[in-house]
Amino acid sequence: KIKKIIILILKNKSDDVIVEFCKKNKIKYFRGSLKNVYLRYISAIKKLKITNFIRITGDSPMINYKLIDMVLNRFNKKHYDIVTNVFPRSFPVGQSVEMINGKIFIKSYKKLKIDEKEHITKYFYNNFKKFKIFNIKSNKNCSKKNLSINTYDDYYKIKKIMENEKI
């Protein structure tokens, strides 16, 4: 069961609008490092006393809640370090869910290369033999579809898909 939803936000003036949205809608948030995404997560884990966490990125506003449930249920049943649906990817981009053991996440920080601090699960996937990772696989390979939204063009593309296709 998900106990808290927390939005991780950059310590950057451009993200003040997100903070205002969170305050207005009584959503918990945490502000952290702009330059080191991994450290932002560690700071949130420690300050908010988080044991495990589910990562869904901001460019994935159309995430399927059933996928979150599948990841959460698998993680809770077998005590994995990570349960994901991107290793290898079979779901569309923009439908990525990762549940990560907080202790393992913190312990791994000292071993990271610079590029692994930006993409927080890259280290685990690069060293997959050292970790218990389970991948949720889609019944149909949709890895070439992109449902993420990073630009206005993405938004209009997704809008068109939603109007014409069952997802």
Range-by-range predicted roles:
Residues 1, 22, 124-125:
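Hydrophobic C-terminal alpha-helix "anchor/cap" residues
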Residues 1-12:
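Short beta-strand/loop segment that forms part of the nucleotide-sugar
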Residues 5-7, 53, 82, 133:
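Hydrophobic/aromatic residues located in beta-strands of well-ordered beta-sheets
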Residues 7, 29-31, 135:
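A structural preference for short, hydrophobic beta-strand core positions in alpha/beta folds
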Residues 11-76:
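Short phosphate-binding loop-to-helix
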Residues 16, 63-146, 153-156, 160:
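Conserved core of the sugar-phosphate nucleotidyltransferase
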Residues 160-167:
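Left-handed beta-helix
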